[in-house]
C-alpha cells in the first residue's frame, strides 16, 4: 500500500486502485487478500446505479478486468457503464445508438471488449461498436432471442438461443443473407446458451422442457449429455460454466440451483435455503470467487443468495443438498432476476424488476449503504394488495402497468404492484372457483404478458392464474403479507384503501372497462382462429400463458396512450392495433408450423439403407418395447420416417433389383459359411451373440439324427434353384401371413419377418437383441421342442416351406411339433430334389433363395415378373454350384453347427451322414416322394 502512495495521493477510487495495484513479491497475495476479505463478510456494501426506465433484464461485465458493464431491459435501450466513473462521480451511462423494438433479454461482450451483442423480444441480434456506439450489423431470427454467447477463441463466432427452440451458430463475417449453422432444434424454447471457456467446441444449453444439455458443435441435432439423472426433463432457465469449464451451474424452475460435473448426468450439489424460491420470473445464476468457490442466484423473495461450494464431494448427504446460504444480500425492493460477479474487483451486480442496478462490494464505496456485519437494516415494505394494483392501473389512465414515455428512473409503483401480485399468487395458491370483480379479471387478462423476461412467468401469467376473493379493507390493513424482513425504504407507497371515485371517474372507468372487454374479445378471437387443431391449441396456450412474450409499446403507442387517457376512442384504436399484432403473430406461427411440416415429406427418399451391402446381415427383430418416443425423440422420429416405407408397395425397378441382389448376397454368404464347416470349424454363431445371427451351440444336439433327416437337411440347404412362378401372387402370399402370429409353425413366423427385411433392414439393425421371448426352444434328437404346450400339427398343405431362410429367426420363437416339422421338411426335399432343377414349375409356396423376392412379387405390378425371373434364374445357377460344394460338408462328422434358418438341421445331417452311399439311397427316396408331392401340388393349384 505504501509503495503506491506516491503514485497518486489523489487516487480516491477503490475500484481504480484494485484494478491498477500490483503487489511485489508473491503474485498470489492479491487473490489471497480478496479471498480472505470476502470470507470474513456477513454482508456487503451496496449502491444503486440509475439510468433505465424499466425492468433491467440483462447485465454483463466486460472481460479482462470488468472495467465496463453493459445493461439492457424493457426500455429497449443498451447502456454502457464505466464502473469507476459510475460509482464515484455519478456519470450517466453511454447509450448505444442501436435500439431494439421490444424488450432486451440478453447481452454479450466479445473477448476484446470492442463489440457488444444484444438480443431481445424483437427477434433480432444487434451488433454494436463500443467506441463509436454505432450499429455494425443486425442478425434476424424467427422468434425472441433469450441467450447469447461469444466464442472464447474467435470473436467472429457467436451462439444464440431463441424461443423457436433453435440454437444457432453465427459468423459475423458472412453476408447478411447467409444462413447460420443450426446446432439444436427442439419444439420448446432455449433460454440460455454458453460456450465452454476452455473447450470452445462444447456448448451448454438450458431448455424450457428438456432441461440442461451439453452439445458438441461437431455433432449437431443431438446432445452429448442431458443432465439431471431421472429428472432430466425439467424446466431450465439458465446455465453457466465455471472458469475451468469443468462444472456447470444451472437454474431450474421451482427447484434449487444445481451444480453438475460436465462428465456426469447426476448432480454434484444442490443449494437451498429457507425463503429461497424461483417460480415467478426468469432468472440467471453465476459463479463467484477467484476459484469459483461460490455461486449466486436471485430469488422471488427480493433477496440475493450466495452459497459456498463444499470442498468435500460427499457433503450434503444422500441428496447432496447444501442447506444454508453463505450470505443473503438484502436490499432489493422487488424480484431479483440477474446477477454477475467480477473476479478482478470482487464486485457483484444484480438487477430485476426495479429500474436500478445494485452494486455489491466488500469495499466501501462513495455514497454506499450497509455494512459488512449486517447490523444496519433497511426498512421493510409490504407487498401491494391486488386491489391496490388494480387501482393503480385504472387510475393511471393508460391501461398499462408500465410507462416508458415519461423516461423516469424513479420507481414505478404499478410495476412493483404487478409483480407483487405474481408473488402473492404463487405463495398463497389462489383457488380457481373464487368470485372476483370483473374489472380485476379484465385487467389481468390485459396484462397477461406485461414485462416479460423481467416478469415473465415460466408457466403462469397473470391471465392464466386463478383468482382469489378480494379481501376486505380490514383484512388488507391487518393481514399485510410480508416476505420476511424486506429491508428496503418505503417510498412511493399507496394507501391500502383506494379513494372513492366520483361520478365522472366512475363513468370514465366504465368506458375503459368496456374498451378492455372489446380488446379481450378480439384477442380471444385471434387465438381461436389460430388454434386450428388440438396441437395448435396447446401451442397457443404455451405461447400466451406459459411463456408470454409481450412487446413494449412503441413511442407512437406511448404518446397516444398518454395523451388520450380520458378518450375511449383512442384506447379502442390502441386495442385494435394490439389485436392486429396478435393476428400477425398467429399467422407467422402458422407459417412457421407449415414450414416445419414440409421438410418431413422428402425425408422418405433418404432411405439409403437398401442399397448398401455391408455383409453384416443382422437378425430381424421387433422394435425395443422399452423405449418410447418421449424418452428418445431422435429415435422415434427416425422410426416414424422409415416405417411408412415398409408398408408401401415398391414399384421402382432399381429397388427390386437391389432386393434380389441383397437376397442373393445373403444366400451366398450363408452357403459359403456352411461349406467352410467341412474343415472342422466351429459354429460362427452361438445363441444370439454374433452379428445378430441366431445360432446354437454344439452341445444342444447330443443325439444324431437318422439318415433320412440328414438328407432332408441337405435338401434344405440346396433347394433354392427354382424360378418364382407367376402364380405366386398376392393371394398366395396372403394365405401364409394369417398363420404367422401364433398358431403357425415357427418357420412361418420367420418367413413373414424376412419378407419385410428389404425395406427396414437398417432400422432393425440398431435394435438387435433387445426383445426377450417368453419361451425357449431346445433340440432333442434333431427335433424342435417348445417349453409351452405342443400344438396340433398343421394341415397337409405345405405352407411357408422356404421360410427357413429367415435371417432373424434368432429373435422369432420356433415352436413346432415333431410331425409338422417332418412334414414340412419332406415337402421341401421333394420340391427341390437336392439341387437339381425341375423341368416343371416349382411349388407355389417356394420361398427358397427367392424369399427375399417374395415381397416384390406380392406387392409389385405383374410387369416386374420378367425381371425377377431373369435375376432369379441367374441366382439359381450360381447357387447350384454352391450347393454342390455344400454336399461335401456332410462327410465330415461333428462339424460346427449353425442354426441359421437356411441350415437349421445341418448339425444333425453332419453327424448322421458318413458316405456317398447313404446319399444315393436317400436321393432315391426323395424321387419317390416327388410323385406324392406333385399330386398335392395339383390339388393346391385347383
UniProtKB/Swiss-Prot annotation:
The modification Phosphothreonine is found at residue 500. It comes from the Eukaryota. Residues 449-478, 490-509, 544-655, 676-824, 889-942 are annotated as: Disordered. Residues 454-465, 760-770, 801-815 have a biased composition (Polar residues). Pathway: Protein modification; protein ubiquitination. GO terms for cellular component: Cul4-RING E3 ubiquitin ligase complex; cytoplasm; nucleoplasm. SUPFAM superfamilies: WD40 repeat-like. Interacts with DDB1, CUL4A or CUL4B. Interacts with L3MBTL3. Interacts with DNMT1. Interacts with E2F1. Interacts with SOX2. Is a substrate receptor for the CUL4-DDB1 E3 ubiquitin-protein ligase complex (CRL4). The complex CRL4-DCAF5 is involved in the ubiquitination of a set of methylated non-histone proteins, including SOX2, DNMT1 and E2F1. This is DDB1- and CUL4-associated factor 5.
